[in-house]
Every structure is written in C-alpha cells, then in structure tokens.
Amino acid sequence: VANARPEALRAAITPRTKLLILPYPNNPTGAIMDRDELQAIANVIRETNIMVLSDEIYNSLTYGPDRHVCFAEIDGMKERTIVVDGFSKSYAMTGWRLGWAMGPKELMRHICKIHRLAHGLCLRPQGAHP
C-alpha cells in the first residue's frame, strides 16, 4: 500500500467501480502511508462516485516514527468512507472476532440490517451435529 500511485488508481477505476478496498496499514509489514499519500488517493476518489472501505485492523501495529492516519480524517472522505476495525490484533484477542464499523449514518443503517440477518449462530443444526 505504501507509495500508492494516484495515476495507477485512476487508470484502474472503471464505470463499474463502486468501492475501493483500502487495507491500511498493511499486514505483515505495518507499512503505512503518510497524510500526503492518503490525500493523493482522496483526490482521485473525489473525481468519482465510489466509496472507500478502509480496513484499519492493524492501525496500532505500525513501526517507526510515523503514525497511522485514519482515511476518514482526510478532508471530504468521512462521508465516503466505511472504516472497519477490531480488537483481536491490537489487544491480542485472537479468536474473539470482535470488531466494529463506522461510516455514513444512512449506509450504516443498511449495513446493520444485513449484519443482523447474516451474522449469528444457527443453533438447531449445530446442536444436532455430534
């Protein structure tokens, strides 16, 4: 992800592009982008109607003097970004599968509806399995 090239991103976007998935910081290196690199990506996004899904689960696992900047903090990106994060990586809670998402209110309302239907245990079949 580091050293992202705006021209390559711009060239990859087609009329069918709806979402940019931004796994940042990157695993396993902890590589991060500085604010200027994120701003360059945001400038390309502003030219389109696409949303950004920013996977920031490794945000506290960065090394060196630079710190993580949330993509939603970049001017004009808050209303176009869904940030997903969790506790398992930063707090050594592997296996707990605890996470969260934040984004534009109306979009999150729909995401929560889908989550309620799609996430959960099907107890009857699991209870019948030896």
Question: Residue ranges of each PLM-predicted region?
Answer:
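Short acidic, glycine-rich surface-loop motifs adjacent to enzyme active sites
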Residues: L20-I21, N27
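Active-site pre-lysine segment of PLP-dependent enzymes
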Residues: A2-R16, P28-M51, Y58-M93, E106
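Conserved core segment of the aminotransferase class I/II
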Residues: I74, K78-P130
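Hydrophobic residues in well-ordered beta-strands that form the structural core
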Residues: I21, V52-S54
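Residue-level marker of structural boundaries
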Residues: K18, L38, R116-G120
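Short, surface-exposed helix-loop/turn micro-motifs enriched in polar/charged residues
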Residues: V1, N49, A118-C122
